[in-house]
Amino acid sequence: MKAKGRILLLTSCLFLLLLLLAKIHLRRRLDVITTTDWLAPVIWEGTFDRKVLEKYYHKQNITMGLTVFAVSSFNGQYLDPFLQSASKFFMPGYRVIFYIMVDKSLKLPEMGHNPLQSFQVLVVSQERQWSDFDLMRMTVLSKHIREHIRFEVDFLFVMSVNMVFQNVFGVETLSTSVAQLHAWWYFRKTTHLPYERRPTSAAYIPFGLGDFYYAGAIIGGVPFQVLDFTHQYLKSVILDIENGVNSTYEKYLNKYFFLNKPTKLLSPEYSWDQTFNIPQQVHYVKVAHYPTDDL
């Protein structure tokens, strides 16, 4: 998978470059940002041609991975709608492995048989008490990517469990490093973005700097890129603990993408907070992000 991944990455980059030069991949939408300053595409409905992308990716014999954590009875209640909707809308027509991280044995919901989909239920060790959910999540994720996920899939997404897919989440989202734009902060002035502003924290971004504010609900890319994020996150958290500082997962995520620019950004359509009114820029909500008491 490692050698295959490198070849796939090179061919993907070449193909997308050709599409860009041919003005096929990115269509114009004047009401939203469709390309970043570092030339990464921002994916909105109407900015891509799925038929062209499908024609390419169906020839690549690729496997997608989707990881979700449901490690308590509280989170477990959201798992059924997540899996039911993901099995319908996440990468339809492609091989998908769902990695479901739980803290106890779990019976999967009844779903229609799909020979392209498989499920791995991975029990999180309870040998130690985790006081920080995100620290646990990234530690466990890093372990499983190293041990087996990187050999099993070509692209990997990690998502929050309190999400419901409403439209196709397809191959237009694939890239080396994928970040999700925050549904609220995308429509706000960059001077107000809630980065970590304390210089003592490893998540620190100085005033006047920063590109976008990214949501922690979705991160994706090729496995080694997701693994790199988990390593950098854990390194930053440990450094802050040693210095007596405490920041948040989302702020560490934003610092990572500030230093390591994502190669593709997903518009707020791919993680829309259901408590917000839908603006005219959002044509279709691909994935609805619900508060943890609304499902």
Describe these PLM feature segments:
Residues 2-133, 144-151, 294:
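N-terminal anchoring/stem segment of glycosyltransferases
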Residues 66, 86, 98, 141, ...:
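Structural signal for hydrophobic/aromatic residues that build the beta-strand cores
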Residues 79-83, 111-115, 135-136, 169-172, ...:
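Short coil/turn segments at secondary-structure boundaries
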Residues 101-107, 162-163, 270-271:
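Short, polar loop motifs at secondary-structure junctions
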Residues 125-158, 246-257:
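A conserved donor-nucleotide-binding helix/loop in the catalytic core
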Residues 138-189:
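GT-A fold catalytic core of metal-dependent nucleotide-sugar glycosyltransferases
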Residues 169, 180-193, 216-232:
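Acidic, glycine-rich loop-and-strand cores that form catalytic or ligand-binding grooves
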Residues 201-292:
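Catalytic core and acceptor-binding pocket of nucleotide-sugar-dependent glycosyltransferases
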